[in-house]
């Protein structure tokens, strides 16, 4: 698990109907990792959110897009990719 000393800001752009989004959200919850979820379908700034997803994916509307505090991002990551990015693998 990530310690309180290494807390990073994580923002996940996704939707409730997206199975990869649901899986990524479960990964964060199961590992006690705080994150902000922005739902493409429900956010009042829907146009900004959609343009952010498209910008990070070279024009593709693939989700989830998970953005980290260093401005890097992962699109449709596996749990193993998330664990590696977050330093959970030993």
Cite the ranges covered by each PLM segment.
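Local sequence-structure signature of Cys/Sec-based thiol-disulfide redox active-site neighborhoods
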Residues: 2-34
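Glycine-/small-residue-rich active-site loops that bind phosphorylated ligands and cofactors
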Residues: 19, 41, 45, 73-74
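Thioredoxin-like thiol-disulfide oxidoreductase module
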Residues: 40-60, 88-89
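Short, structured active-site "lid" loops
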Residues: 52-75
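Non-catalytic, surface beta->alpha helical segment in thiol-disulfide oxidoreductase systems
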Residues: 68-90
């Amino acid at each position: 698990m990530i310690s309180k000393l290494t807390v990073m800001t994580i923002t996940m752009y996704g939707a409730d109907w997206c199975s990869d989004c649901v899986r990524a959200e479960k990964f964060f919850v199961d590992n006690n990792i705080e994150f902000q979820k922005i739902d493409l379908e429900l956010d009042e700034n829907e146009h900004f959110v959609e343009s952010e997803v498209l910008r990070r994916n070279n024009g593709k509307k693939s989700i989830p897009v998970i953005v980290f505090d260093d401005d890097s991002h992962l699109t449709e990551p596996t749990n193993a990719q998330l664990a590696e990015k977050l330093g959970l693998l030993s």
